[in-house]
Amino acid sequence: MTESTFPQYPRLILSKGREKSLLRRHPWVFSGAVSRLEGKANLGETIDIVDHQGKWLARGAWSPASQIRARVWTFDKAESIDIAFFTRRLRQAQQWRDWLAKKDGLDSYRLIAGESDGLPGVTIDRFGHFLVLQLLSAGAEYQRAALISALQTCYPDCAIYDRSDVAVRKKEGMALTQGPVTGELPPALLPIEEYGMKLLVDIQGGHKTGYYLDQRDSRLATRRYVENQRVLNCFSYTGGFAVSALMGGCRQVVSVDTSQDALDIARQNVELNQLDLSKAEFVRDDVFKLLRAYREHGEKFDVIIMDPPKFVENKSQLMGACRGYKDINMLAIQLLNPGGILLTFSCSGLMTSDLFQKIIADAAIDAGRDVQFIEQFRQAADHPVIATYPEGLYLKGFACRVM
């Protein structure tokens, strides 16, 4: 397609000097950078982004009610946003996942990781022959039909299920959606394989898209720390860390979560892998309260896994989140035997690795214990981070030896 045959997109004109982030290929335009919109654009519609002199910078999606006024689809002026565009992006992403799946023997992985795969607001996880779709931005929702058409072209044998039932959609004025898009309905629990483990995934009712694929490598790493150890698995969800700990030869693993449904699946996962169920305990409780109760009763563990949900959604919550992370890690440190291992994580994108490390250090000081950092974790390689979008590195973790 020649430039003269392109659709005439509305133009988002930036204020003078506010083009620097786009020149560095960052995919977001914030409200404070916007001078005006020239032409009319509906929510999520494609727009051209230009500097104050009219020089073309990028092509993106318009979101007038969001702090992020535009999310960039492409920095290539010759690229239109259509089915062919999404097909190219999908095939480019699949090349990397094919290599990973073959190398690690995976049947489930993140196929599209939003901005880092050039599709802002789009998350797609693959579980066997099911593609689970989350559209998290107005632009992604506006392009729903084109994206689904591209998915059907690239994956004709896969069923597509929509899990766009996340609260973040409300920030851009979108309703929550969930249900089958094409093909069969996922079973209530779908078995997948991960580094020798068989795990049941609840696509329809589970957290996010059903399972935390981003912690795959951290679950595997757990095995080298747990042989003959007593393990406490906090915020256990469906027991991926617990199964991995049992496969690593732990003496006992106690899994704690507030959801009985998740704990029931965790128990099934232990049984599915034919592991010793007598070594696994499942406790429905609030982790903060239980850790304090354990401290009062003198309970001790050799390894503690701390994988809490996101504590911070925006900058205004960061201080409170820091206190939460500090308190819970302090409690964990107090419960560890000398020489014990704390595997602790944060999935909050606003929490940098440096800040998280400082929080753990402060928690150790408050606990009156010395801590050595011995290993660092991040999201699995099917969740890549593009260099121009450091916000994509949201999951970070540390293995700490507590003296």
From Swiss-Prot:
A cellular-component GO term for this protein: cytoplasm
Catalytic reaction(s) noted: cytidine(1962) in 23S rRNA + S-adenosyl-L-methionine = 5-methylcytidine(1962) in 23S rRNA + S-adenosyl-L-homocysteine + H(+)
Broadest EC class assigned to this enzyme: transferase
Subcellular locations according to the entry: Cytoplasm
Residue stretches making up the PUA domain: 9-88
UniProt entry tagged with the keyword Transferase: yes
InterPro entries: PUA, PUA-like_sf, PUA_sf, RLMI, RlmI-like_PUA, SAM-dep_methyl-trfase, SAM-dependent_MTases_sf
One function term, GO molecular function aspect: RNA binding
EC numbers: 2.1.1.191
Keyword annotations: Cytoplasm, Methyltransferase, RNA-binding, rRNA processing, S-adenosyl-L-methionine, Transferase
Matches recorded under NCBIfam families: PRK15128.1
Function: Specifically methylates the cytosine at position 1962 (m5C1962) of 23S rRNA.
Protein known as: Ribosomal RNA large subunit methyltransferase I
Organism the protein comes from: Salmonella paratyphi C (strain RKS4594)
Lineage per the UniProt record: Bacteria, Pseudomonadati, Pseudomonadota, Gammaproteobacteria, Enterobacterales
The gene coding this protein: rlmI
